[in-house]
Amino acid sequence: MQHLLKSLPKVDTLLAHNELKMFQKSTLLPLIQSHLSLLRENICSNTLSPKELESALNEIIPVIKKKAIEATKPTLTRVINATGVVIHTNLGRSVLSPQILDEITPFLRSYHTLEYDLAKGKRSERYTHTKQILCEMFGCEDALLVNNNAAAVLLILNTFAAHKEVIISRGELVEIGGSFRIPEVMKSASSILCEVGATNKTHLKDYENAINEQSAMIMKVHQSNFKQIGFVKQCHIKEIIHLAQKHHLIDYFDLGSGHIGALPLADEPSVREICKYKPSLLSFSGDKLLGGPQVGIIIGKSQLIAQLKHNQLLRALRVDKFSILALQATLKAYQNKEYHKIPTLAMLAFTPKELESKAKNLKKRILASSIASELEVEVIPLHSLAGGGSVPHLSFDSFGISLQAKHLQVQDFEFALRALGLISCIQGEKILLDVRTLLEGDEERIMEILGEVLSS
């Protein structure tokens, strides 16, 4: 047994092997130690025959190399979203178009005036690059960016209501994804929650009766990821603004999803609509219905925005150059009515007729391919969702295809597709692919994935 154990190569010898030199020692060392330990166990337990051991020794380098490649593969990989959920939170929310990326890439590849005033030759603020366009679009006095809307909520509460009361309706104490709850955020911001009204009904008098010397703010939160129906009432933001002004308090509307108003989305409030009432502060997301990068956008009165800029938290919550450039390009597309540059808007605006045609073309490609005999394919009507915690009561008539593999169970089929980056849905014994959320080039990749799965 000892001579067999001595036949195992030394760790240092393997680390120095030409086939493994491309990998870091920190990656290789645990893989080598683990593999050698397994071989030692097999030798000591007489699990391997001499011939099997010889084969295992010859395979050490290829096995270690394969494991090292797997260990160093990026975990963030591209996938195809065939779920029909446009702003898919788990798949990165809104997608940026090639046109937007082409516009901002030259800036990312060079130095630029992120915080530099060319005219004065002095340092400037990074927030100036989007302030003008936001003020022009919404008629507000000033604007500020942070890294997401949750950061906007935290910054606003901490700046204006630390150790003071924030009045809010019980029906608006929402929780969004990742267990982000308004009451918990208030606690983190050192604000005191003053909840008024009932879960289903809150009247203006409920807010007014709660105002006292400790009150700093009346906050309204948009119920963006759920819908109350029936015996319900919530106060309009116009009423909240007037009440806050009457009592010299700050009114703040956390709009969340950030619908600009470019699409008719039933009764979903838009930023433009709310800005007509001149709120003190309003915040919303950049990567939901706006269709841009992940940012939190704060707009409102210049005096209040100036105070936000002096909060030390802003340094920890500030946006980077990519987000600023991407938002600026997205907003310019809105200004110029170039909605085709914003994939989120384009996908939500597809008509059922366009989607049916797209689904029929995909079916035709599959039936004309070498895997046609392995599948049953049908064009079917579907219902897409906006996603991103937005307009939960709305679905969009869509089309897609159903796939049923003749020699695979549906769960195994779905797993195989997912492993290669095709994210789909299961209905009964069939895989559903909603074509609404397919991007340019996705159909070609779908054909490759289906071919790989069904020909193996």
Swiss-Prot record:
N6-(pyridoxal phosphate)lysine modifications at: 288
Keyword Protein biosynthesis appears in the UniProt entry: yes
Molecular function GO terms recorded: L-seryl-tRNA(Sec) selenium transferase activity
Keywords for the protein's UniProt record, in alphabetical order: Cytoplasm, Protein biosynthesis, Pyridoxal phosphate, Selenium, Transferase
GO biological process: conversion of seryl-tRNAsec to selenocys-tRNAsec; selenocysteine incorporation
Transferase keyword on record: yes
EC number assigned by the record: 2.9.1.1
Recorded metabolic or biological pathway in which this protein acts: Aminoacyl-tRNA biosynthesis; selenocysteinyl-tRNA(Sec) biosynthesis; selenocysteinyl-tRNA(Sec) from L-seryl-tRNA(Sec) (bacterial route): step 1/1
Pfam families documented for this protein: SelA (PF03841)
Catalytic activity: L-seryl-tRNA(Sec) + selenophosphate + H(+) = L-selenocysteinyl-tRNA(Sec) + phosphate
Top-level taxon of origin: Bacteria
Cofactor(s) essential for the protein: pyridoxal 5'-phosphate
GO CC entries: cytoplasm
InterPro entries tied to this protein: PyrdxlP-dep_Trfase, PyrdxlP-dep_Trfase_major, SelA-like, SelA_trans
Top EC category: transferase
Localization per Swiss-Prot or TrEMBL: Cytoplasm
Family: Belongs to the SelA family.
Described function: Converts seryl-tRNA(Sec) to selenocysteinyl-tRNA(Sec) required for selenoprotein biosynthesis.
NCBIfam families: selA
Name this polypeptide is given: L-seryl-tRNA(Sec) selenium transferase
Organism: Helicobacter hepaticus (strain ATCC 51449 / 3B1)
